[in-house]
């Protein structure tokens, strides 16, 4: 293939997991991973990571990580557009590390700088006895694979509770999407911005 007829397009993502708001908790850290479709492949960067532990300041209720993100994907089509899954952990009353929140968001479609705030949630026990037992044993309900957060299967039967927010900042660059017929320019009429150029007259 020549450079005039590319077979793939590139999505370059960098930015940071900036901060979190969990009013009831302190001394938290986060893990992240990317979830993407079968036609997508990472070409450089890290697919997953774990941050440092952060504490609230005297005058601030925010937990600041400023944890860097940097990854590049290649794909032949936008189906299965990458999502980032963030899991937040911290100590409970007994000093055990327990999950404080899960959340996911799609990587922005349009090039440029974007800020996203993810509402976080935690799975809950289905009965009071299970709640008491899990609190006593220090084993709260959690997903065995956090990537399930970005997928729909089985989510409708999971009992969850909203808890906190995480803010991420993205810098997005795309390459060769226009050459493959995809327009990612932001317009007022299509906020997602991901439409076939051939459909626009």
Swiss-Prot record:
UniProt keyword Cytoplasm, yes or no: yes
Residue span, C2 B9-type domain: 9-126
Record flagged with keyword Isomerase: no
GO biological process: cilium assembly; smoothened signaling pathway
Keywords: Cell projection, Cilium biogenesis/degradation, Cytoplasm, Cytoskeleton
Intracellular or extracellular location(s): Cytoplasm, Cytoskeleton, Cilium basal body
A cellular component annotation (GO) from this entry: ciliary basal body
An annotated Gene Ontology molecular function: hedgehog receptor activity
InterPro entries for the chain: C2_B9-type_dom
Domain of life of the source: Eukaryota
Pfam family, one: B9-C2
Family: Belongs to the B9D family.
Record's function text: Component of the tectonic-like complex, a complex localized at the transition zone of primary cilia and acting as a barrier that prevents diffusion of transmembrane proteins between the cilia and plasma membranes. Required for ciliogenesis and sonic hedgehog/SHH signaling.
Quaternary organization: Part of the tectonic-like complex (also named B9 complex).
Protein name, per record: B9 domain-containing protein 1
Upper lineage: Eukaryota, Metazoa, Chordata, Craniata, Vertebrata
Name of the coding gene: b9d1
